[in-house]
Regions:
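Short alpha-helix
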Residues: 152-168
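Active-site micro-motifs of SAM-dependent methyltransferase domains
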Residues: 87, 105, 109, 139
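Conserved N-terminal segment of class I S-adenosyl-L-methionine
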Residues: 1-87, 91, 97-101, 117, ...
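A short glycine-rich, Lys/Arg-flanked "PGG" loop and its adjoining helix->strand segment in the class I
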Residues: 114-129
Length: 231
């Protein structure tokens, strides 16, 4: 997993870090878990949600195939289970909320995407939440495929809601987002990021951030979908 090791090792820009913190805070509020509750995260990335949950006095466990990521979570004080998803090597009804940020789109097809949702539903306690955040193919266009080579399952608001129903979950909300933004502002910023000339922006940023850093920030601000469902 050399690509993802390098991806996580590369520093975020100041703007990128601020946007990510704001986005994580917004997702954290959607979890609806009180201090002392338990959160399970699929694909913890750089550990931002792990850190936020532990700071709030919650129990936290992550599942990831990357040993480097699992080690980071343990250093933060959380639990980590190394393995591919799905299935999820977690007990039935063991979490008050299950969170998957930028994970569903990495499933190879709709059957694996459905299996992932079914597994998240299994791990959530009765009345618990499943919170999913994924890019919107309709807004990202070719950038959905270009941003990461492992993107396999096209995610849209409609498709995520359909899987949610088939997994036996009750949708609570399915809102468009762009980084930490929502509503009309998310739509406007997402559209601007899609249409802004990438080469021009990279040239203007030359000497301050790399073209790759700009591209990551740009794709992070394209329209995405934040789905909240209950078991």
């Amino acid at each position: 997993m050399a690509y993802y090791d390098a991806l996580f090792a590369s520093p975020a820009t100041g703007l990128g870090a601020r946007l990510n913190r704001a986005q994580i805070e917004r997702h954290f509020r959607r979890l609806g878990v009180a201090p002392g509750g338990r959160v399970a995260e699929i694909g913890p990335g750089r550990g931002e949600m792990a850190e936020r949950c532990l700071k709030a006095g919650m129990s936290y466990v992550a599942l990831d195939a990357n040993p480097t990521v699992c080690a980071l979570v343990r250093e933060l004080g959380g639990e980590a289970v190394e393995g591919l998803a799905p299935p999820l090597a977690l007990e039935d009804g063991s979490a008050d909320a299950v969170y998957a940020n930028s994970v569903v789109e990495h499933m190879p097809d709709h059957l694996r995407a459905l299996e992932l949702f079914q597994e998240m539903a299994r791990v959530a306690r009765p009345g618990g939440r499943v919170v999913v955040h994924s890019p919107d193919l309709l807004a990202c266009g070719v950038h959905f495929w270009n941003s990461e080579y492992s993107h396999g399952f096209p995610t849209t608001r409609r498709r995520l809601l359909q899987i949610c129903h088939d997994a036996g979950l009750r949708p609570v909300s399915a809102e468009y987002a762009a980084g930490p933004l929502s509503g009309l502002s998310a739509r406007a910023v997402g559209l601007a990021m899609r249409r802004f000339p990438h080469n021009l922006a990279a040239a203007l940023c030359l000497g301050r951030v790399s073209a790759e850093q700009w591209y990551k920030t740009r794709t992070a601000l394209m329209r995405s979908v934040l789905l909240v469902a209950e078991k």
